């Protein structure tokens, strides 16, 4: 490789001279093997010959260069890019399974709430039998226990009565506290 003159030199050269000197140091592209550095993608349309070309009856030889035309798959590629852009921007209109499940859960909740609020709805299922309020409450409790108030029987079952064993133990505790004080005196 050639050594360039230092920046201290007083002689000024034109840009063309500098480029000529730089390019002379580079290898000549015509000397290299073309097969090793060849670009592999040809950008040639994959459709068979004759489909995209205009056929001219008078000429036996058609020109090798075709006028520019979009590739067959360019519409698909553009559609995929537009889809990605919509997804990135948050404008995606496709319904995902997560959205479907959320919508169905909301609809189910609204249906149950509407059903449980209507007292006449239970009569449709009983078919003429007289149902009292306790039957409806029992049915509501079975469907949605968190929506129905706790009955007095359930409260009594949940809160155990205080046992008689705990009261004497509570009375013995102050007496036990007095004994160590008496022992210290």
From Swiss-Prot:
Coiled-coil blocks: 78-98
Keywords: Ciliopathy, Cilium biogenesis/degradation, Coated pit, Coiled coil, Membrane
Function: Regulates clathrin-mediated endocytsois of cargos such as transferrin probably through the association and modulation of adaptor protein complex 2 (AP-2). Has a role in ciliogenesis. Required for proper cephalic and left/right axis development.
Pfam families according to UniProt: CCDC32 (PF14989)
Membrane topology summary: Peripheral membrane protein
Pathology linked to this chain's protein: Cardiofacioneurodevelopmental syndrome: An autosomal recessive disorder characterized by global developmental delay, feeding difficulties, microcephaly and dysmorphic features. Additional features include cleft lip, cleft palate, variable cardiac defects, and abdominal situs inversus with asplenia. Brain imaging reveals cerebellar hypoplasia.
Any single GO CC term annotated in Swiss-Prot or TrEMBL for this entry: clathrin-coated pit
Signal sequence coordinates: none
Spans annotated as Disordered: 159-185
Subcellular compartments: Membrane, Coated pit
Broad class of the protein's primary localization: membrane
InterPro entries for this protein: CCDC32
Subunit structure: Interacts with AP2S1; the interaction is direct and mediates association with adaptor protein complex 2 (AP-2).
Superkingdom per UniProt: Eukaryota
Protein name: Coiled-coil domain-containing protein 32
GO biological process, one term: cilium organization
């Amino acid at each position: 490789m050639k050594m360039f003159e230092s920046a201290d030199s007083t002689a000024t050269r034109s840009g063309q001279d500098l480029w000529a000197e730089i390019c002379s140091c580079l290898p000549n592209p015509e000397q290299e093997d073309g097969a090793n550095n060849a670009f592999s993608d040809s950008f040639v349309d994959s459709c068979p010959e004759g489909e995209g070309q205009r056929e001219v009856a008078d000429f036996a030889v058609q020109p090798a260069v075709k006028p520019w035309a979009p590739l067959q798959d360019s519409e698909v590629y553009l559609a995929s890019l537009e889809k990605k852009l919509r997804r990135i921007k948050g404008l995606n209109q496709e319904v995902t399974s997560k959205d479907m499940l959320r919508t169905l859960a909301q609809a189910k909740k609204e249906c149950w709430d509407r059903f449980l609020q209507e007292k006449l709805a239970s009569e449709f299922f009983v078919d003429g039998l007289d149902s009292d309020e306790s039957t409806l409450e029992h049915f509501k409790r079975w469907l949605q226990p968190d929506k129905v108030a706790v009955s007095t029987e359930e409260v009594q079952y949940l809160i155990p009565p205080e046992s008689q064993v705990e009261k004497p133990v509570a009375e013995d505790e102050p007496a036990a506290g007095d004994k160590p004080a008496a022992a210290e005196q």
